């Protein structure tokens, strides 16, 4: 996966994780979650400062289930989707599988349940950066580019409609 200079710059502005811990790792997981939230807050603030705000995310109390909204603008129209994912027990070795359930079956670049396909480009990059990458990097390098490619195609094929006020 070759990254553009603007992508590299945006990625460098997201804090990296220091703790290699998953949901079964007790206090280490609590520390990892703190790092995840700090990175997400920095990523969202950077996006807002650049007028590139495109998602909201929250988790359950133990940080194992995440949900929210993401959106993409195409031809001056906003397309908004529910986004969700679970943290795998093997996290951070295994990247989360981000899902947009309402798009299930509408594109070939998706698995059952609306999980977006990231295997060819993103997963090797994730594997090389364990444990430094986290949720913010998964959104920056996974979901964001996926939306940029798939939303225009889905619109052109008449598969999705813009969000109405």
Swiss-Prot record:
One of its GO terms (cellular component) is cytoplasm. Keywords: Ubl conjugation pathway. InterPro entries: UBQ-conjugating_enzyme/RWD (IPR016135), Ufc1 (IPR014806). One of its GO terms (molecular function) is UFM1 conjugating enzyme activity. The keyword DNA repair does not apply. The active site is at residue 117. It comes from the Eukaryota. GO terms for biological process: protein K69-linked ufmylation. Disulfide bonds: none annotated. The keyword ATP-binding does not apply. Pfam families: UFC1 (PF08694). E2-like enzyme which forms an intermediate with UFM1 via a thioester linkage. Belongs to the ubiquitin-conjugating enzyme family. UFC1 subfamily. This is Ubiquitin-fold modifier-conjugating enzyme 1.
């Amino acid at each position: 996966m070759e990254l553009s200079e603007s992508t590299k710059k945006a990625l460098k502005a997201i804090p990296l994780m220091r703790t290699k811990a998953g949901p079964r790792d007790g206090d280490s997981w609590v520390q990892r979650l703190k790092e995840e939230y700090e990175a997400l807050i920095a990523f969202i603030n950077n996006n807002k400062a650049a007028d590139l705000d495109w998602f909201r995310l929250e988790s359950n109390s133990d940080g194992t289930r995440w949900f929210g909204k993401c959106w993409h603008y195409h031809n001056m129209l906003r397309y908004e989707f529910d986004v969700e994912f679970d943290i795998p027990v093997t996290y951070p070795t295994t990247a989360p599988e981000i899902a947009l359930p309402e798009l299930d079956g509408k594109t070939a670049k998706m698995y059952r349940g609306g999980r977006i396909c990231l295997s060819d480009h993103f997963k090797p990059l994730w594997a090389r950066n364990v444990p430094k990458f986290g949720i913010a990097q998964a959104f920056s390098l996974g979901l964001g580019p996926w939306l940029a490619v798939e939303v225009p195609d889905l619109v052109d094929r008449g598969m999705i409609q813009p969000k109405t006020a």
